Amino acid sequence: MVKEEKQENRGSVEFQVFSFTNKIRRLASHLELHKKDFSSERGLRRLLGKRQRLLAYLAKKNRVRYKKLISQLDIREK
C-alpha cells in the first residue's frame, strides 16, 4: 500500500526539475503583476540556477533522459 502511493521518486532529477519548473512558472506570473518585488525576483533567479545545474548534470549523465525531459516540460535547451 505504501509503495502504491509513492509511485514517483521525489529524489529523481526529473521530479526535481519538474518541481522547480512549476515554482518558476508560478513566480514568473507573480512577477508580471508585481514588477518591483525584488526579493521574489532573487528567489526566481536562484531556482533558475538550481534547475540549470540539475539539467546540466542530467545532460552529462544521460542525454536521452535529458532530451525527453526538456521536450515534456517545454524548456529551451541551452
From Swiss-Prot:
Gene Ontology BP terms: translation
Keyword Ion transport: no
N-terminal signal peptide: none
Gene3D superfamilies: S15/NS1, RNA-binding
Record-level Gene Ontology MF annotations: structural constituent of ribosome
Gene Ontology CC: one annotated term: ribonucleoprotein complex
Keywords: Chloroplast, Plastid, Ribonucleoprotein, Ribosomal protein
Stored SUPFAM superfamilies: S15/NS1 RNA-binding domain
Compartment annotation: Plastid, Chloroplast
Family: Belongs to the universal ribosomal protein uS15 family.
Classification via PANTHER family: RIBOSOMAL PROTEIN S15, BACTERIAL AND ORGANELLAR, SMALL RIBOSOMAL SUBUNIT PROTEIN US15M
NCBIfam families found in the cross-reference section: S15_bact
Protein name: Small ribosomal subunit protein uS15c
Species for this entry: Sorghum bicolor (Sorghum)
High-level lineage: Eukaryota, Viridiplantae, Streptophyta, Embryophyta, Tracheophyta
Gene that specifies this protein: rps15-A
